[in-house]
């Protein structure tokens, strides 16, 4: 997993992959779209959104 742009369904799929059974919280207010879609994010940054 390298730092990459993740938008829309790709972002959701990546969160499912990273978080697994823990699940994740996805609200527009968290800035994940700005971080991962507008910019790039790492696996470690995605883990911050897991429950």
Curated annotation (Swiss-Prot):
It holds the Pfam family Insulin. GO terms for molecular function: hormone activity. InterPro entries: Insulin, Insulin-like, Insulin-like_sf, Insulin_CS, Insulin_family. PROSITE patterns: INSULIN. It comes from the Eukaryota. Keywords: Carbohydrate metabolism, Disulfide bond, Glucose metabolism, Hormone, Secreted. GO terms for biological process: cellular response to oxygen-containing compound; glucose homeostasis; glucose metabolic process; positive regulation of protein secretion. It is found in: Secreted. Disulfide bonds join 7-37, 19-50, 36-41. GO terms for cellular component: extracellular space. The species of elephant is not given, but it is most probably the indian elephant (Elephas maximus). Insulin decreases blood glucose concentration. It increases cell permeability to monosaccharides, amino acids and fatty acids. It accelerates glycolysis, the pentose phosphate cycle, and glycogen synthesis in liver. Belongs to the insulin family. This is Insulin. It comes from Elephas maximus.
């Amino acid at each position: 997993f390298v730092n990459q742009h993740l938008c829309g369904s790709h972002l959701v799929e990546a969160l499912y992959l990273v978080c697994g059974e823990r699940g994740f919280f996805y609200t527009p207010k968290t800035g994940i779209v700005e971080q991962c879609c507008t910019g790039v994010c790492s696996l470690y940054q995605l883990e911050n959104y897991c429950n």
